[in-house]
């Protein structure tokens, strides 16, 4: 379980006990007890089987694939997979590839519904570029939603990460985008459910030249993405 779950859960359990002592019964303590149970469940962090193999990109989050598209950016043409996380999904984020954190760019913004296409540009977000061991770069974005008001990223530039390793959290419903060069074969489709760290999203195609189209300026992606 994520540490936040213990904090919220224990705090509400204390509230429930205080209410019980003040009222002499448990009827008024039911609500904080239910909320405590919800937070303990919401911040769950199940173990995942991380797939092995070369050139694989795994999902950085649990949720539903809402878009698979090609977009134009100042860095060239990229492929984007968007994943919507409802309040019922696990909200732990995981690294899509093994490598080194090349850059982290935080952008203040709005809190539009994560299903709104405009949320990719206007919402609060954190853009992370991971330079894979094979040399290419994969970008993923933690995007806040209508209820998600806090983005957590636990790594720093230069840190080593493994494929499927826990790297952050988005609280209470959100969206995660992953951007990759054209030289990757997409293995998921719109509407498919994915699991963070275990579902394979894409595979690098041999001889596809994935290095040339790798994004290098994550701070500009949010405002300049254009669908093809």
From Swiss-Prot:
One of its GO terms (biological process) is phosphatidylethanolamine biosynthetic process. The record marks 173-174 as: Cleavage (non-hydrolytic). Pfam families: PS_Dcarbxylase. Binds 1 pyruvoyl group covalently per subunit. Its cofactor is pyruvate. Pathway: Phospholipid metabolism; phosphatidylethanolamine biosynthesis; phosphatidylethanolamine from CDP-diacylglycerol: step 2/2. This is Phosphatidylserine decarboxylase proenzyme. It comes from Acidobacterium capsulatum (strain ATCC 51196 / DSM 11244 / BCRC 80197 / JCM 7670 / NBRC 15755 / NCIMB 13165 / 161).
